[in-house]
Amino acid sequence: MSTGKIVQIIGAVVDIEFPAAEMPNINDALVSQEANVTFEVQQLLGDGVVRTIAMGSSDGLRRGMVIENTGDAIKVPVGKATLGRIMNVLGEPVDHGGAINAEDKWSIHRAAPAYDELSNSTELLETGIKVIDLLCPFAKGGKVGLFGGAGVGKTVNMMELIRNIAVEHSGYSVFAGVGERTREGNDFYYEMKESDVLDKVSLVYGQMNEPAGNRFRVALTGLTMAEYFREEGRDVLFFVDNIYRYTLAGTEVSALLGRMPSAVGYQPTLAEEMGKLQERIASTKKGSITSIQAVYVPADDLTDPSPATTFAHLDSTVVLSRQIAELGIYPAVDPLDSTSRQLDPLVVGEEHYSTARRVQGVLQRYKELRDIIAILGMDELSEDDKAVVTRARKVQRFLSQPFFVAEVFTGAPGKYVPLKDTIRDFKAIVDGEYDHLPEQAFYMVGSMEEAVAKAEKMQAEHK
């Protein structure tokens, strides 16, 4: 094992000099026993000097400190021993639960599956959330993006998806918290504990307050754990909150390494780094990784290079809208902006497809009529348009749903709605079968039976 010495420290970037014949390779892990910090080699500068990123605070480091080369990339524990545990970017436990006795350790840098190993299953993954199952269904082994600005509910939606899928489908999940709030990570841990699904989830956190190196690599740590479960032949879920912070950490690292920035100050290697991560999130003939990724949209601008680069890799996009959140409709999913490759009659069936398109058609017509209503009022509309508007308002409210993970805030018990019920109920609304019910009865309920019961209760209170 070769040793070198620190020659320069600039924030998280540390230059280390080795004997010319014993230079480490790119992505090798170097360790300081004295400061208990791991470094990852990013550039070979020549004359025996390598430029590295510290996977921890560089406080306490000094020039001349001895650094050892491990001769390998960062390796993290994988397998069942990681379930129910919180780990950092190096796979070390941070939950005071003792050591992780994993049967194996894998490198966080791995090649994507070969082309002939990939599978192309079109099986649907039912989430129990009406608006998602109807309008932007998820594929088992697909990639989903939850797009939204600050505070529109990305993390809450993700927590609900983990809870529903873990409880209803009983599969393993890996959650990578990339550069998010420590408070959310804490809430998330206790939410999983209360829902009795913690023993099926591996948690890997690289929070906002951690150095850029940790935030940049923590997604790869989580992905490596998910890949192990896939290679065992399992169907695993991989959650990332938040992909934007992964890009942002890459931008910080890139600037520290002295690379020239590209559009909007992002790193020039943005598309390559995103591709390396996303291409590994794949389903093979052995097992599948279904990935759900929260994507923060800076200033609600979907054309920003970071969300725009992410779009290209996804099968389904769930766009969370501030305008819908302002109406008090949660989940605040935009039914006209959200898309899915699975919404195809050959995949979901003719009834599901036609119901989804009719729901979108009604909402689109309502959107067009809104300006006329604002200027002239409802009375100036034709009878057909009046019917469209009342149905659209009912559909809009029926797309809301009480969440299990938000019970403490809303006071309403959460609801899981099977897909067949969702299709039946929305078809009935657009067919006009429930034109006699008040629109308020459709707000924050699960199935149509609840909406009818709510309407009867409202009528009884009015008498």
Curated annotation (Swiss-Prot):
For this chain, the annotated S-S bridges are none
> GO molecular function: any one?
proton-transporting ATP synthase activity, rotational mechanism
Q: Which InterPro entries does this entry report, sorted A to Z?
A: AAA+_ATPase, ATP-synt_VA_C, ATP_synth_F1_bsu, ATPase_a/bsu_AS, ATPase_alpha/beta_chains, ATPase_F1/V1/A1_a/bsu_N, ATPase_F1/V1/A1_a/bsu_N_sf, ATPase_F1/V1/A1_a/bsu_nucl-bd
* The organism's place on the tree of life at top rank: Bacteria
* Recorded GO CC terms: plasma membrane; proton-transporting ATP synthase complex
Q: Where in the cell is it found?
A: Cell inner membrane
Q: Where this protein primarily resides, as one coarse class?
A: membrane
Query: Which residues does ATP bind?
Result: G148, G149, A150, G151, V152, G153, K154, T155
Q: How does it sit in the membrane?
A: Peripheral membrane protein
Might you give the EC number(s) for this enzyme? 7.1.2.2
The answer to keyword Ligase applying to this record is no
What's in the keyword line of the UniProt record?
ATP synthesis, ATP-binding, Cell inner membrane, Cell membrane, CF(1), Hydrogen ion transport, Ion transport, Membrane, Nucleotide-binding, Translocase, Transport
Cross-referenced SMART domains? AAA
Q: Does the keyword ATP-binding apply?
A: yes
Which HAMAP family does this entry report, sorted A to Z? ATP_synth_beta_bact (MF_01347)
What does the record give as the function of this protein?
Produces ATP from ADP in the presence of a proton gradient across the membrane. The catalytic sites are hosted primarily by the beta subunits.
Subunit structure of this chain's protein? F-type ATPases have 2 components, CF(1) - the catalytic core - and CF(0) - the membrane proton channel. CF(1) has five subunits: alpha(3), beta(3), gamma(1), delta(1), epsilon(1). CF(0) has three main subunits: a(1), b(2) and c(9-12). The alpha and beta chains form an alternating ring which encloses part of the gamma chain. CF(1) is attached to CF(0) by a central stalk formed by the gamma and epsilon chains, while a peripheral stalk is formed by the delta and b chains.
Q: What is this protein called?
A: ATP synthase subunit beta
